[in-house]
Amino acid sequence: VLSAADKAHVKAFWTKIGGHAGEYGGEALERTFLSFPTTKTYFPHFDLSPGSAQVKAHGKKVGDALTLAVGHLDDLPGALSDLSDLHAHKLRVDPVNFKLLGHCVLVTLALHHPDAFTPAVHASLDKFITTVSTVLTSKYR
C-alpha cells in the first residue's frame, strides 16, 4: 500500500518527467526487450530493432498509462481497469513481464534523473510500479 509519503514522492518525481513519459516508456520497453528477450514473444508483429517506431509508439502507451496511474493514486484499480482487462483477457501477457518492464522503467528513470532519484524516491517509485503491476494482473485470477 502506498503511504502518503510514497504518493508525495511519486507525484513530485513525475513532475520532473514532464512531457517525457512516452519517450521514457519507449526506452524502458526497448531496454526490456534487450535485457529479457523472452518478452519479445508478445510482439511478433513489431519491428523490435533499436529506435523502432512501433516500440516507441507502444512505449508511449506505457508512459501514458503510468501518467494516468500517477493521477489516480487513490484509485488505481478503477483507473487501470480497462488495461487490466486488456492484458489479462485479450493479450494474455504473462504477469512476470510486468515486473521485468517495471524494473526497466526504474532504471530508465534513474538514468534520466539521477539527482532526484534518491533512495526514498526509489523505494516509493518501486512500490508504485509494483502496485500498478499488481492491479494490471489482478484480473488474471
From Swiss-Prot:
Residues 1-141 form the Globin domain. GO terms for biological process: hydrogen peroxide catabolic process. GO terms for cellular component: blood microparticle; haptoglobin-hemoglobin complex; hemoglobin complex. It holds the Pfam family Globin. The modification Phosphotyrosine is found at residue 24. The modification N6-acetyllysine is found at residue 16. Keywords: Acetylation, Heme, Iron, Metal-binding, Oxygen transport, Phosphoprotein, Transport. Disulfide bonds: none annotated. The modification N6-succinyllysine is found at residues 7, 11, 16, 40. Belongs to the globin family. Heterotetramer of two alpha chains and two beta chains. This is Hemoglobin subunit alpha. It comes from Bradypus tridactylus (Pale-throated three-toed sloth).
